[in-house]
Curated annotation (Swiss-Prot):
Keywords: Allosteric enzyme, Glycosyltransferase, GTP-binding, Magnesium, Nucleotide-binding, Transferase. Allosterically activated by GTP. This is Uracil phosphoribosyltransferase. Its EC number is 2.4.2.9. Binds 1 Mg(2+) ion per subunit. The magnesium is bound as Mg-PRPP. Gene3D superfamilies: 3.40.50.2020. InterPro entries: PRibTrfase_dom (IPR000836), PRTase-like (IPR029057), Upp_B (IPR034332), UPRTase/APRTase (IPR050054), Ura_phspho_trans (IPR005765). GO terms for biological process: UMP salvage; uracil salvage.
Amino acid sequence: MSKVHVFDHPLIQHKMTIMRKVETGTKQFRELVDEVASLMAYELTRDLPLTDVEIETPVTKTTQKMIEGKKLGIVPILRAGLGMVDGMLRMMPNVKVGHIGLYRDPETLEPTEYYLKLPTDVAERDFVVVDPMLATGGSAADAISSLKKQGAQSIKLACLCAAPEGVKRIQEEHPDVDIYLAALDEKLNDHGYIVPGLGDAGDRLFGTK
């Protein structure tokens, strides 16, 4: 079964609390999503392989560590996932970015895919699927399935806020995909929103209703 990593760093908890506040405006919300995504990227890349390299400093020659040519990819689930991309790119500027477009049916709460664009070398990359909210888990599960159908072998899921129902669905449908969260909340309400959550992340990111 996939592992669930919930980040308890004080900076992440502080920023998540401000993000949750109903009075937090679009500009600040967008900045906070970006900042938390950057902080999460630090932990998401903890297991990257290192190799020894010979370099020369202004003082002497020395052997130091660098990341060993790992191919990475970030795949935001449109549209809210876009808010996490720049923060992660700041930490991993050379990664390729794919996109998966999904919308959730307001009646069934199930996702429908309308767009998919990925790097050509899918099988050679380690992917991180990003979406601020993991509610029912339907969109994330479908996005991961789409990646696998295209040949992806290594996938992680990174979300700001999750409900236990969404985590359970990912673990059941994709037990090989580890889940990285800034917060694991209590439950879903009758409308499919995470409680206490932070509202509709897409609307709050882009100033729409």
